[in-house]
């Protein structure tokens, strides 16, 4: 059984990859999750392509590739952490940006909506993906 730190990362990476798969298969679903309109300007179509590409393919493959790297038994933990670090920082940055928006963009946001839900979710995902790094010191002894 993998260490508990790895399990946290595996669950978070699998969850994020599943979100990406959902967006890839159903861009309407992705539009509802992120509360954006696919084509707000009829003169500039292509919104569904963006949902499939950015929220779908990118999210799916970046998390799936990190999960595959994490599952490599022969690969030393520091190398796995190098693969996980930028993805974790992306989620932590998303949470930080959303927190700033909650504080600074009150008028533009009109209502908090799901912002207070997404902030802890993004922070949890970031720390969960980075969790194997917390066991790094023990593995080097």
Regions found by a protein language model. Name each.
Residues 69-106, 110-116:
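Transmembrane helix-loop-helix
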Residues 47-71, 89-93:
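Core segments of alpha-helical transmembrane spans in multipass integral membrane proteins
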Residues 6-25:
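N-terminal signal-anchor transmembrane alpha helix
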Residues 1-7, 44-50, 54, 75-82, ...:
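Membrane-interfacial loop-to-transmembrane-helix junctions in polytopic alpha-helical membrane proteins
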Residues 50, 113-129:
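Small-residue-rich segments of transmembrane alpha-helices in multi-pass membrane proteins
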Residues 26-48, 101, 105:
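Cytosolic, membrane-interface loops and tails of multi-pass inner-membrane proteins
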Residues 129-141:
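Juxtamembrane boundary at the C-terminal end of a transmembrane helix
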Residues 16-22, 62, 90-94, 118:
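Alpha-helical transmembrane segments of multi-pass membrane proteins
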């Amino acid at each position: 059984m993998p260490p508990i730190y790895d399990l946290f990362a595996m669950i978070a990476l699998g969850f994020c990859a599943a979100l990406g798969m959902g967006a890839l298969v159903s861009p309407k679903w992705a539009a509802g999750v992120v509360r954006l309109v696919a084509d707000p300007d009829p003169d500039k179509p292509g919104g569904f392509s963006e949902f499939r590409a950015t929220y779908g393919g990118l999210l799916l493959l970046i998390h799936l590739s990190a999960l595959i790297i994490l599952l490599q038994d022969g690969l030393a933990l520091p190398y796995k952490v190098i693969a996980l670090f930028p993805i974790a920082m992306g989620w932590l940055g998303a949470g930080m940006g959303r927190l700033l928006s909650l504080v600074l963009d009150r008028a533009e946001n009109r209502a908090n909506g799901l912002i207070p839900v997404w902030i802890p979710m993004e922070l949890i995902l970031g720390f969960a993906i980075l969790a194997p790094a917390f066991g790094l010191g023990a593995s080097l002894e």
